From Swiss-Prot:
Pfam families: Pyr_redox_2, Pyr_redox_dim. It comes from Pyrococcus furiosus (strain ATCC 43587 / DSM 3638 / JCM 8422 / Vc1). This is NAD(P)H sulfur oxidoreductase (CoA-dependent). Catalyzes the CoA-dependent reduction of elemental sulfur (S(0)) to produce hydrogen sulfide. Can use both NADPH and NADH, but shows a preference for NADPH. May enable S(0) to be used, via sulfide, for iron-sulfur cluster synthesis by SipA. Also shows coenzyme A disulfide reductase (CoADR) activity with both NADH and NADPH. However, CoADR specific activity is about 20-fold lower than the sulfur reduction assay and CoADR activity appears to be an artifactual side reaction and is not thought to have any physiological relevance. Also shows NAD(P)H oxidase activity with both NADH and NADPH. One of its GO terms (cellular component) is cytoplasm. Binds 1 FAD per subunit. The active site is at 45 (redox-active).
Amino acid sequence: MEKKKVVIIGGGAAGMSAASRVKRLRPEWDVKVFEATEWVSHAPCGIPYVVEGIAPKEKLMHYPPEVFIKKRGIDLHLKAEVIEVETGYVRVRENGEEKSYEWDYLVFANGASPQIPEIEGVDLPGVFTADLPPDAVAITEYMEKNKVEDVVIIGTGYIALEMAEAFVTRGKNVTLIGRSERVLRKTFDKEITDIVEEKLRQHLNLRLHEKTLSIEGRERVEKVITDGGEYKADLVIIATGIKPNVELAKQLGVKIGETGAIWTNEKMQTSVENVYAAGDVAETKHVITGKRVWIPLAPAGNKMGYVAGSNIAGKEIEFPGVLGTSITKFMDLEIGKTGLTENEAVKEGYDVRTAFIKANTKPHYYPGGREIWLKGVVDNETNRLLGVQAVGAEILPRIDSAAAMITAGFTTKDVFFTDLAYAPPFAPVWDPLIVLARVLKF
C-alpha cells in the first residue's frame, strides 16, 4: 500500500486512538492531528476532581504531546482550528495564519459541545461549563481570585452531580436546579433516582421541576432566577447536556444520523468515501436493539478511534455497538447502569418484567458490608436480561458483570448459575446479582 495522508480533526481520546493505531500499522504514513485547544489525549471526565482538589490539572492529559510527536511520529498541531473541509483537503487556522493540508483519509473526532440555554446572563463572569480541561483551569482560577460561597448548578445529569460533589466537598453551599421532575431521568428508572435524590438532599438544596429564567449580576454573577425562586450564586455551572459537533461534517456532505450525530457503519466509515468518524461526534448502534444511538462515553470513544484507525490502515475490524454502560457517584453513593432501563425497554416494544432488590455487599457477620440496590429488566418472552441498574456501594463488579452477561445474551437462568467468586471479605455467598436473577425468576 502506497504512502497515504491521514488527517484527523480532534486530539481527544478518539482522535489520538485513531492516529496512534494508524501509525502503529502504517508507520511510514503521514498522520496529522489538528486540535483546537492546547490539550491532547485529554480526560474531561476528570474535571470535577480537579475542581474538588484531588487531581492536578496536568494529569488531565493521558500523555503529553511529546509522546505522540517523538515516540509515535504523529504530526500533532495544537491550537489549530479546522475551519473548512473539502474533498481532499482541510483548511486550518493556526498561529494567526490559514493553511491548507491534503488528505487521502479523514477522521472526524471533534467531539461535542455544551448545550447552553438561551437565557440572559450566561456570559457573565463566574458562569462556566465543565466540558473540557480548560474549564477546570478557569473554574479553579476563578475560585482562587474571588470569594465563592454559594454555587448554583443548572442540570441534573452526570456532570451536574459530579460537579455538585466537588463543591460540596469544598464546603460550598450548593443549589442544584433541574427542569425535569427527577435527576438522571434519561438514564435511570424512578426506583434508583429516588435513592439518589434522598442522598442529594442531605448535602445540598435540590430544586426540581424549575425552569431557569435568567442569571443576574453586575460585574459578575450574583444570583440565578427560576420560575420557582431566586438563588444566591457566586459561581454557576451550566451542565444541561451536550451536542455533537457536526458543522464541519456537513460542509463535506457527510450524512447526519437520526440522533443528530454523524452516521457511521460498523467500521466507523461515514457516508462519504475514505471519511470516518469516532467518539462523541459519531452515532453507533445499540447492542440490544440494533437501533441507532448516540451515547457519548469515553470507553466507547476510545474503541471507536481504534476501529477507525485499524480500518484506515487496512486491518478490517468492526465496532459492535454499545450498551450505555456507565457509572458515577455522589459522595459515598455509587450509581450505575448497563443496557436498557424499564422505560427504555417498554418504549422499544419489549414485554418486560422487573425486579428491584436491596442486598448487602458482605455477609451479615463480616464488618464493612454496605447496602446495595439493584434493578433488573428482563424480556418476558425469552427471559433474556435487558438491563441492570445499581445504586449503593460496590456496584462496579455487578454492573460490569451484567454488561458482559447482556452482551453474551444471558437469560436469568444463565445469570443465576454463573459461578461468581465468594469469600466473606468480598461478597455474600448469594451475590446481589445472583439474588436479582432469582427474584426475576426463570
